[in-house]
Amino acid sequence: MPLAKDPLHPSPEEEKRKHKKKRLVQSPNSYFMDVKCPGCYKITTVFSHAQTVVLCVGCSTVLCQPTGGKARLTEGCSFRRKQH
């Protein structure tokens, strides 16, 4: 009787939804990102799960607010995920 799912070759979407410790290869859910300020266009590096309010170095506007998990970016801010 064949299995319905292949445990050694899960789909990428299925792997993303799993807990970080239960994936085939363990990997964290958090990352660093470059956030661009909508006012002065300066780029600040922010942790995705920041636990404090992050302010822009140039104009002191709020870039992101902490929530229970991931930090919520302020409207108008653009970000890009940093590479390893």
From Swiss-Prot:
It comes from the Eukaryota. This is Small ribosomal subunit protein eS27. Belongs to the eukaryotic ribosomal protein eS27 family. Residues 1-25 are annotated as: Disordered. SUPFAM superfamilies: Zn-binding ribosomal proteins. The lineage of its organism: Eukaryota, Metazoa, Chordata, Craniata, Vertebrata. The keyword Phosphoprotein applies. Its cofactor is Zn(2+). It comes from Pongo abelii (Sumatran orangutan). The keyword Transmembrane helix does not apply. Residues 1-16 have a biased composition (Basic and acidic residues).
